[in-house]
Structure formats: structure tokens, C-alpha cells
């Protein structure tokens, strides 16, 4: 996803890996529910290619159809650099690919 975000933008990368029933909590707002709603929510917001993230923990269920990742992210802009952490819950699709069903995070002090 990092490579896709660097090339196409953060929002486009997330949409490429989002399950149709995705839930995306938003700071100070109700969560956005559904891939189409998420695409609409982001349609008027500026996208960025200057974000990267690195998982530090990943686990999958015994059945192999659900999993999660935890990690850190970094956003570099002209005037500042922001840091944070994230959580993502993944669901295996019928075609064997993984899509995320829940994704959220927050800002943190510099590591």
C-alpha cells in the first residue's frame, strides 16, 4: 500500500484495499460506513502522497479469514511532519485477497 500511496495518493490506496462494508472512524465525527460513502467523504479533501506507514504487529485468526495490523505512520508536508499510529482489521475475500474492514488511528508525539 505504501508504494500505491506514493504513486496515486493516500486516499486512492486506501480505497483500493477497502472492503465494500468498510468502517472508517473520523476524529470528532461519526464514522464513515461503506466504500462508496468513504469515496464521497474524501472527494473534496486534498490527498497526499507524502505519507508512509510501517506495521509493528500483525496477527490472523486461526481460521485465517480475519486479521489485524498495528503500526506507525508519518506524514511529511511542506511546513511540518506529523507522526501517529494506526490499527487496521483485515478480512480475507473469496478470491483470497485481503481487504480492510476497519481502519483508524491518531497522531502521536515524534517517536
Regions inferred by a protein language model and the residue ranges of each:
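Short, structured motif recognition centered on aromatic/hydrophobic residues
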Residues: 1-2, 66-70, 89-90, 98
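Long compositionally biased, domain-poor regions of proteins
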Residues: 3-7, 16, 42, 76-78, ...
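A solvent-exposed, acidic/Ser-Thr-rich amphipathic alpha-helical stretch
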Residues: 9-62
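A mature extracytoplasmic/lumenal domain signature
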Residues: 18, 28, 62, 72-73, ...
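Hydrophobic/aromatic beta-strand elements that line small-molecule binding cavities or substrate pockets
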Residues: 42, 55-59, 72-75, 85-92
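Short, cysteine-centered beta-strand-loop-beta hairpins and adjacent loop/turn segments enriched
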Residues: 47-49, 75-81
